[in-house]
UniProtKB/Swiss-Prot annotation:
NCBIfam families: CPSaseIIsmall (TIGR01368), PRK12838.1 (NF009475). Residues 1-192 are annotated as: CPSase. Disulfide bonds: none annotated. Residues 196-381 form the Glutamine amidotransferase type-1 domain. GO terms for molecular function: ATP binding; carbamoyl-phosphate synthase (glutamine-hydrolyzing) activity; glutaminase activity. The gene is carA. It holds the Pfam family GATase. One of its GO terms (biological process) is L-arginine biosynthetic process. L-glutamine binds at residues 51, 244, 246, 273, 276, 312, 314-315. The keyword Amino-acid biosynthesis applies. This is Carbamoyl phosphate synthase small chain. It catalyses: hydrogencarbonate + L-glutamine + 2 ATP + H2O = carbamoyl phosphate + L-glutamate + 2 ADP + phosphate + 2 H(+). Its EC number is 6.3.5.5.
Length: 384
């Protein structure tokens, strides 16, 4: 049921399917790729994850906004979603860290939201037909009129959205995870010489930077357009390739830079978009998934070991395109797509999921330790 005085809103998919509901965010019209996220928690982290740039996110969990929002859970400086779709929402959150309700937060950041939608039916449609463009409006309440706006929007395939979310200036990240968090600073790394990591920012999440800092890394974040020569001027011990939105094959500057960085043979770790860019740089290909992987309980593994992982991506590395010197370390166990790879001889590895969680499980936090060990090992070999 709508909250008293709620304004009518309309969601329409690119195939013309209408979903009438009520507004719980800003007024206006928005168009983006309609996707779904199956997580029961973490809506604030999802909305502020730059990887969701250009997307209207359907939350499958039937209640949204119960814990409000707060400054600590922001994964970037502002939300990047184009819109939010919910079954039911609350305007009166209950959580000791909450400083604002979700509807007020969306209004502040000019994000359009619609609730009262049968999100189960919508999700089943997206699973069956595939993710597609759509639009939400509080102004245009006739499906055919809104459809004209949707049809004018570009497809996610071939779209370079990294340029919209990458940093424009180089900066150093110093904040590590707090002591009261389950995964705080890593004790065995305290007191050791710091490692310099240059993070190529395709749309990096803050908790990735926190985890690197927690493992004793000095993290320098650079724009996605930074050249290999400029990166190597920092004399990094390792190079990190971040997550990000859009089609990885369209991030041409990042691919060229990564190819050139491979020649330096420095330890390299990629997450999500970074995994795809590393794969492309090693000669692989990528393809668009039918509806993507977005949620907190995606099983990944190889042989006997399984990790429950947080994922958010709509593209994947094509298994048959990998070069002989590259091996698969993980598969997504739901659909057997490539979820991790590494070079057989050189210190390059990547995963298609988010070991930093935020939100999600911490099964794969060990990958940050693996990266640190590779850097310390190479540094010791050079010094010795």
């Amino acid at each position: 049921m709508p909250i008293a005085a709620a304004k009518p809103a309309l969601l329409v998919l690119a195939d013309g399917t209408p979903y009438p509901g009520w507004s719980f965010g800003a007024d206006g019209t928005t168009v983006g790729e309609v996707v779904f996220n199956t997580g029961m928690t973490g809506y604030q982290e999802v909305m502020t994850d730059p990887s969701y740039c250009g997307q209207i996110v359907t939350f499958t969990y039937p209640e949204l906004g119960n814990t409000g929002v707060n400054a600590e859970d922001e994964e970037s400086i502002h939300p990047h979603v184009k819109g939010v779709v919910a079954r039911n929402i609350t305007r009166r959150p209950s959580n000791w860290r909450s400083t604002q309700s979700l509807p007020d937060y969306l209004v502040e950041h000019k994000i359009i939201g619609i609730y009262g939608i049968d999100t189960r039916a919508l999700t089943r449609k997206l699973r069956s037909i595939g993710a597609m463009n759509g639009g939400i409006s509080t102004e245009i309440l006739e499906p055919e009129a809104l459809l004209h706006h949707i049809q004018a929007a570009p497809s996610m395939a071939g779209l370079n959205l990294v340029k919209e979310v990458t940093t424009h200036e180089v900066y150093e990240w110093t904040d590590s995870t707090n002591d009261h968090w389950q995964f705080g600073p890593v004790a065995e790394q305290q007191g050791q010489p710091p490692l310099t990591v240059v993070a190529l920012d395709f749309g990096v999440k803050r908790n990735i930077l926190r985890r690197l800092a927690s493992y004793g890394c000095r993290v320098i974040v650079v724009p996605a357009s930074t050249s290999a020569a400029e990166i190597l001027q920092y004399n990094p011990d390792g190079i990190f390739l971040s997550n990000g939105p859009g089609d990885p094959s369209a991030v041409e500057e990042g691919i060229v830079t990564t190819k050139e960085l491979l020649a330096a043979k420095k330890p390299m770790f990629g997450i999500c978009m970074g995994h795809q860019v590393l794969g492309l740089s090693l000669g692989a290909e990528t393809f668009k998934l039918k509806f993507g992987h977005r949620g907190l309980n995606q099983p990944c593994g190889l042989e006997q070991q399984v990790e429950i992982t947080s994922q958010n991506h709509g593209f994947a590395v094509t298994e048959g395109s990998l070069a002989e010197e590259v091996e698969i370390t993980h598969f997504n166990l739901n659909d057997k797509t490539v979820a991790g790879l590494r070079h057989k001889e050189l210190p390059f590895f990547s995963v298609q999921y988010h070991p930093e969680a935020s939100p999600g499980p911490h099964d794969a936090d060990y990958l940050f330790e693996k990266f640190v060990k590779l850097m310390r090992q190479q540094k010791a070999e050079v010094a010795g």
